[in-house]
Design a protein with these regions (language model features):
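Alpha-helical scaffold/interaction cores of sigma-54-like transcription cofactors
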Residues: 1-455
Length: 455
């Protein structure tokens, strides 16, 4: 994120929304990192919010956690739906003031009362309270916008995506709806919107001047896997890989190889193995291969089914010798450099499939072995044409049968999935549906808008 912004001439400002917990209330504040120390504190608070919370509640930090790790962080208080807004509407004004005073004392000039104007219910009451609190507590105001999409015409697409996530219907009038003001406003619009509180807008325009920090590129820090025999991960990788190759040649490779000379087979495989080991060690990834090998061997030993390997990782002979994969890359003419080569910037990534019913046992093993060195990561995917049709069709209230009929008009080709627009262009029945049914036209319009929103 930071590198891409820097390349287009924009300085990144790194921040995160963190939940706070106090007085029976949980809600968000926004924190921004001024320095590398601030960035460390931000990531620590994010981790603490998950580590200290039980599964029945939202991840959140205690006020003491925030105070103890506030160095080089800037705090914005959020809107009427966030932590301080919730305290106000729950009539916990005493707790509001106590916490604000504690934060003001510790954050000093690094705290702002946030003002947001989205033309939403109860927004004005909270704003008036914040304006008065700003004067009495001498905490500066900052005008901000909660942006969910770029352009104003993306409101309906965002609303549809929200309904998909919440399993609601668009026509349900009892659900919570955001206003249509959550788009990225232009400079002139902000000047007009906050003309009565120019100091809040000025603090917004000058906010970026408080930041010169940019996270440095770092290589992953992996646990060192070695034993007394090997002294280093590199030596341990070589030892295990060579032992594994001997086992593979003896039990599998000789029986299947078209080459009948055992010495010739050994030379081909040993040359390839040494080539791969040299590349892996030169890139400091020996520990990664050993870690993956260890938990796969553990899973197999504990009767947890593991896939044979897929993706470019199946091209590694080292992986085959370490039991990470069960595919002989030389037999199938697979290329190691597709998985790892000195020109590859990012870390290698094995695609490992575990039995769905027992995969949690693998997580538990990793947590017991590496303690707080283990974390889950989030991934984002795009909806394929058929799934997008089903999801948006459902929130529009179309019947299952109708949506299913539309989905069957989308050609299924796993090798080259068609976009929705390509399917519509190829299928005349789609055009008939659009012509005869306003809801189907709405469905396709929303799908086009959601596609633009994602892109």
């Amino acid at each position: 994120f930071s590198e891409k912004l820097s390349k287009v001439g924009t300085h990144p400002i790194i921040g995160s929304q963190i939940n706070l917990k106090a007085g029976g209330t949980i809600g968000k504040v926004t924190l921004y990192a001024k320095t590398n120390q601030g960035y460390k504190n931000l990531t620590k608070l994010s981790s603490l919010s998950y580590l200290k919370s039980n599964q029945s509640e939202e991840p959140a930090c205690e006020i003491n956690d925030l105070v103890s790790n506030n160095r080089d962080l800037i705090l914005l208080t959020g809107n009427q739906r966030d932590f301080f807004g919730k305290l106000y509407y729950e009539n916990k004004i005493k707790i509001f003031n106590e916490i604000i005073n504690v934060l003001k004392k510790n954050f000093e000039n690094r705290i702002y009362f946030e003002v947001q104007r989205h033309n939403e219910i109860d927004e004005k009451n909270y704003e008036n309270f914040i304006l008065n609190s700003s004067k009495s507590l001498k905490i500066p105001l900052i005008a901000t916008q909660e942006v969910f999409y770029i352009n104003e015409d993306m409101y309906e697409a965002h609303d549809a995506l929200k309904c998909i996530g919440e399993k609601n219907f668009i026509e349900d009038n009892n659900r919570f709806k955001f206003s249509n003001e959550h788009y990225l406003k232009k400079h002139e619009e902000l000047l007009d919107l906050y003309s009565d509180i120019p100091e809040a807008l000025e603090n917004n325009f000058n906010f970026h001047l408080r930041f010169s920090f940019k996270p440095k590129k770092t290589k992953p820090i992996l646990p060192s896997i070695a034993n007394a025999q090997s002294n280093s991960p590199e030596n341990e990788l070589q030892r295990q890989a060579k032992e594994g190759l001997e086992n593979r040649i003896k039990n599998f490779i000789i029986q299947k190889s078209k080459i009948k000379n055992e010495n010739e087979i050994k030379k081909i495989y040993e040359d390839r193995l040494n080539h791969e080991i040299n590349i892996i060690n030169s890139m400091d990834y020996a520990s990664y291969f050993l870690i993956v090998s260890d938990y796969i061997k553990w899973a197999k030993k504990n009767s947890i089914p593991v896939g044979p390997g897929r993706g470019s990782g199946a091209g590694s002979l080292v992986a085959y010798c370490l039991d990470i994969t069960d595919l002989d890359p030389i037999e199938y003419d697979l290329i190691f450099e597709r998985f790892l080569n000195p020109d590859r910037i990012s870390m290698p990534d094995f695609d490992i499939d575990f039995c769905e019913e027992k995969r949690d046992k693998v997580f538990e093993y990793l947590k017991s072995k590496y303690k707080d060195g283990v974390a889950h990561i989030i991934t984002f995917g795009k909806l394929k044409a058929r799934m997008a049709l089903r999801d948006v069709g459902r929130v529009l209230g179309l019947s299952y049968g109708h949506v299913d009929r539309l989905c069957k008009m989308v050609p299924f080709d796993p090798s080259r999935p068609l976009t929705l627009q390509e399917s519509i262009d190829r299928e005349p029945r789609f055009k008939e549906e659009v012509k005869n049914n306003p809801k189907v036209k709405k469905l396709l319009d929303l799908l086009e808008m959601t596609r633009k929103k994602v892109n």
